[in-house]
Design a protein with these regions (language model features):
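Conserved small/polar residues in nucleotide/adenosyl-binding loops
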Residues: 162-168
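C-terminal amphipathic alpha-helical interaction region
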Residues: 1-160
């Protein structure tokens, strides 16, 4: 009413502006969800599973080289990592699938405002949960195997760029 009273925007223009903002928000979350799902399924889970396989092979080799009690002691950490990788990759897969289904439901909503709310309430929390487990896998998987830049590498590059900009 205030915008209309001073001739800035009509109610219809204000509603249209909000509609665009809601649609933009939804599109950004859609893109983020698709990219995260793709990265999780096509990069992160395969790399984590390969590392897990390497750990399993290491455990079997320890068992063939050492007496049972020593092999168990030497392999304990690897067995913990194997289980953690299995738990985290299963969680990621289940939640990526659930997120895809939640997106399908949200995408059927006609109102851009209601669709944005659905994305905020269901998709964003799923993204955060998936991301948490991916971050934990990033810390576990061998650096040589991890195909994506790690946070510390991005931070280091960012710091280098920042310091070189400051020097110029």
């Amino acid at each position: 009413a205030m915008f209309e009273a001073i001739g800035v925007m009509t109610k219809k223009e204000l509603e249209a502006r909000n509609e665009v903002k809601w649609e933009t928000y939804t599109k950004k979350i859609q893109i983020e969800a698709r990219v995260l799902g793709d990265l999780a399924m096509n990069h992160i889970i395969p790399v984590a599973t390969q590392y897990q396989t390497d750990l399993i092979n290491n455990v079997y080799k320890m068992q063939s080289l050492f007496p049972a009690d020593k092999a168990a002691r030497l392999s304990a950490k690897n067995l913990e990592l194997i289980e953690e990788i299995a738990d985290r990759t299963a969680f990621i897969k289940e939640h990526v699938d659930a997120m895809i289904e939640a997106r399908k439901v949200a995408n059927k909503i006609e109102s851009e405002r209601e669709k944005a709310i659905a994305y905020h309430d269901t998709i964003v929390p799923a993204l955060e949960e998936i991301r948490y487990h991916i971050d934990k896998l990033e810390l576990i998987v061998d650096n040589q195997m991890w195909t994506l830049p790690k946070y510390r590498e991005l931070l280091f590059v960012s710091c280098l760029l920042y310091t070189s900009d400051a020097a110029d």
